[in-house]
């Protein structure tokens, strides 16, 4: 509960910068995720950790209905404002996914985007979505991933936590697949994309533990697959990153998630 409260406060404060961030708002990336989801037309979707409604808007524009939930009241306010033109097909609530009323389920699909690296327990987070999806429904997890090498991943996570006190851990691509499988999903598919972060833009919308100069210094001391810093001639710093989208299908018959 304490972690969820910290997340709510952090994202209330960074909502405006988050909504404008190129990585979050890129229309082409959002469209690719909608296509990867491959949901049947007119599906009813749960957006877990919906933020300011960027992904919800993309699914709504594709003809689906979306119910979004987020811990941050400011994110929910922005999502409602952004998606108001879609009328009753769009609904949003402030709160924890784990407390989401099962009476409004089942959904045809559930999706989370850039959320798992803030989850205290990624498996429990995905299982909470699975519990609210109908048999044969779809669950999609999309997140920034890290290096399979433990030392490189540890360096990466140290940087992330220095820049954002709410960060827990980036999963590797394999771990992301494993979480969906352990949650009881089958036919799991994975697709990976490269993306870039500008260090200053990325740092400035975080909740840092260390100062910007110190985090920059630490960044220049290492590299990892999915998090590779590269100085630019203009004095800026680009981070070359990887994001993975994993898609699983809930079996039609009874299936128990594994622990």
Predicted regions: what they are:
Residues 109-121:
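A short SAM/SAH-binding and catalytic strip from SAM-dependent methyltransferases
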Residues 101-109:
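A short acidic, Gly/Pro-enriched loop at the edge of an enzyme's catalytic core
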Residues 1-40, 54-58, 75-78, 82-85, 140-162, ...:
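Conserved class I S-adenosyl-L-methionine
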Residues 169-183:
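Short alpha-helix
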Residues 123-135:
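A short glycine-rich, Lys/Arg-flanked "PGG" loop and its adjoining helix->strand segment in the class I
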Residues 52, 183, 187-259:
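Conserved Class I S-adenosyl-L-methionine
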Residues 46, 52-99:
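Class I SAM-dependent methyltransferase SAM/SAH-binding core
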């Amino acid at each position: 509960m304490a972690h969820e409260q910290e997340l709510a406060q952090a994202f209330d404060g960074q909502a405006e910068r988050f909504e404008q961030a190129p990585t979050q708002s890129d229309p082409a990336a959002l469209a690719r995720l909608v296509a990867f989801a491959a949901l049947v037309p007119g599906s009813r979707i749960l957006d877990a950790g919906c933020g300011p409604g960027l992904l919800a808007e993309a699914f709504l524009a594709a003809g689906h209905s979306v119910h979004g939930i987020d811990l941050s009241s400011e994110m929910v306010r922005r999502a409602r404002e952004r998606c108001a033109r879609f009328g009753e097909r769009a609904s949003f609530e402030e709160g924890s996914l784990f407390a989401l009323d099962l009476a409004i389920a089942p959904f045809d699909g559930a999706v989370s985007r850039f959320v798992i690296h803030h989850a205290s327990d990624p498996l429990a987070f995905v299982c909470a979505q699975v519990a609210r999806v109908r048999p044969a429904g779809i669950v999609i997890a999309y997140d920034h991933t890290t290096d399979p090498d433990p030392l490189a991943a540890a360096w990466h996570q140290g940087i992330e936590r220095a820049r954002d006190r709410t960060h827990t851990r980036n999963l590797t691509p394999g771990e992301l697949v494993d979480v969906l499988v352990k949650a009881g999903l089958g036919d799991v598919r994975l697709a990976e994309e490269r993306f870039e972060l500008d260090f200053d833009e990325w740092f400035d919308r975080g909740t840092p533990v260390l100062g910007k100069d110190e985090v920059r210094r630490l960044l220049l001391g290492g590299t990892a697959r999915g998090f590779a810093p590269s100085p630019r001639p203009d004095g800026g710093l680009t981070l070359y990153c990887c994001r993975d989208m994993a898609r699983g299908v809930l079996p039609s018959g009874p299936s128990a998630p594994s622990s």
